[in-house]
Amino acid sequence: MRFLFKTDYEDDIRLFPHSGYYVSYGLLLAVLLIAPYVLSSYLMSQLVFVCIYATVGVALLILTGFTGQASLGHAAFLAIGAYTAAYLQKYGVPFPVYFLAAGLLTGLIGALVGFPALRLQGIYLVIATISFAFIVEEILARWESVTNGNEGMRIKAVSLFGVAVSRDGPTFYFLCLAVLVLTIVGTLNLLRSPTGRAFVAIRDSETAARSMGVNVALYKVKSFAISAAITGFAGVLFAHKLSFISPEMFTLQLSIEFIIVILIGGTFSLHGAVLGAIFIVMIDPFLTYLKDDMPGIIAGIAATFGAGTQAAANVQSKVAAFASLNGLKGAIYGIIIVLFVLFEPLGLYGRWLKIKLFFQLFPLYKRATFKRQKIYVKSERNR
Amino acid sequence: MLDFVQQLVSGVALGCVYGLIALGFVLVYKATEVVNFAQGDLMMLGGFFAFTFIGMMGLNYWVGFAGAVAAMALFGMLAERVVVRPILGYPQFSIIMATIGLGYFLRSVSGMIWGTDDFKIDTPFSQGVLRIGSLVLAHDKLSVIAATVILCALLWLFFNKTMLGTAMRASSENMLAAYYMGIPVKRVVSIVWAISAAVATCAGVLLAPITFIHSNVGLVLGLKAFPAAVLGGFGSIPGAVVGGVLIGVIESMAGFYLAEGWKDVAPYVVLLAVLLLKPEGLFGLHVRKKV
């Protein structure tokens, strides 16, 4: 195993701690760059969604993972970004301008949400962000002169340097990938700056942070604004990818999906946002695959274990009927959330770290390394 | 004026349902500092249980009602055992996520079992109306109001006058200290979940004649019950009901007097206003942390 010998703070905050990182991330980048020429168009489309979800995931990580402010209202920020883009595009504003404008506006609204949120903690903050999202959703449905109400808005393809970029083509994918990579690098830099350290300090203990001279209010508002702005950028891409937006796309359901992204990925590292996004976006094609192919496979297994043709066909039709039940996807979602919270609280990235550590320490790995400590906190009401 | 009273009564009836769901939130919150996002879905499930007993198996209304309450109390214990107990003592956010997951699961599974249609339970008070002058009050709405008042009173007495209630309050203040004092915290939490599921079932059954039972009813009403619980101060039993009634009245008044669209938003606007001006709610306790 490799020991990193650090002699000063600069060593500690390097983006690439050792040369191995260049190799692995270089390889990853190469794979991502050739992906559009290899994968099917459906998978490419899913990959674009992975980029968008991961961008939102990173935004949410800044707020929830690193500043400790839970939010169940990020669908509203996404909606604001998407609608700003659609509205400005209608008046012939070029893409780079409305892209930035959407982020700026969403960031501003995020800051405005952040101010009232200063007084709120824990569950109250969650409820307040839910209410904010509801109000935004209703405004989008009612403000018909701008948002076209429930009929929704169409949004034309991105035009970069006078060339229209198809939403299914590789160029759009590269655009989303670029936004994601820039977001991740920007966030990494943010997190190793004084601002990022203040965020983490606020997450770990607000009282302690304040007594160390951190302006808690300022940094909370900053965190909200930055998180919202990034979500706004993602919203522009989201709108372009779907080419049609309407208020009912930006419901609580979507906010919960974003939370699931970071919960499943892991809330303590930016890797989590990407892994979680892959999981959430890819679960759809996976379930479709299960629905289509699983009955046949199970019938095949039944047949090999000596079941007659009649019985195998019977099994196949039963499984098919079960797989096409209406709410199955929701049930699987629910089970996945509960299982992750119960058994893998550090998320997929935590699992990856555990596996890595297992091989690094091979015979000496012990499970207690990652054991969560129970804190039977005193009442939050006395906080 | 007559319109106003009519709106007021239907607002109060609706508000009582919110209040009953909010009661469930408050009970669980009081005992464990956990916010149960699946509370609305427990209500929905209770309604479906009652529908199964009464509508499908043809039992007497009261027998079916009691059966549904008992079944749901057991189910509440089960849900607590499986989903909440293993993560008790961990950050609140993970528990919230777990209950959101539970809610998803319950919604989908009940959609699979009972289908996605609207169901109606025939109750003894479905038909009758009470006439006071030219005011017409439906019995089903009055039944909701009466049941809420009774339940609220019973629960308040339970929490403040019985030993078990005191144990629950103690474990909510400080779980570890309560444990040291000989309170079986795990069993207490389990009982709280049973009670809150039972209360949710009452809400579901009483609600059935008013809004019907379908698999999404819990989500819709559960989210409306949040403003109620916050308005009353998360953690106060009378507060939950008062908050629920206020939210119900605000909603029905906004639907009647304000432009279209306000009806759905008004509770949340009120909620945000309350959070900004008086985050501890109307009946809440607020103590600053002393270092």
Task: Specify the residue positions occupied by each region the protein language model found.
Chain B
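Hydrophobic core segments of alpha-helical transmembrane domains in multi-pass membrane transport
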Residues: G47-T52, V69-F75, L102-S108, A147-W156, ...
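Helix-loop-helix "hairpin" substructures at the membrane interface of multi-pass membrane proteins
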Residues: L14, V136-H214, I237-G243
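Residues that define the loop-to-transmembrane-helix transition and helix capping
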Residues: A38, W62-V63, F93-S94, M163, ...
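Alpha-helical transmembrane segments of polytopic integral membrane proteins
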Residues: A22-A31, A50, F75-G76, E80-R81, ...
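Single transmembrane alpha-helix segments in multi-pass membrane proteins
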Residues: F4-M56, V82-Y90, S94, L231-I237
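Transmembrane helix-bundle core of multi-pass membrane transporters
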Residues: P86-K161, V188, M253, L258, ...
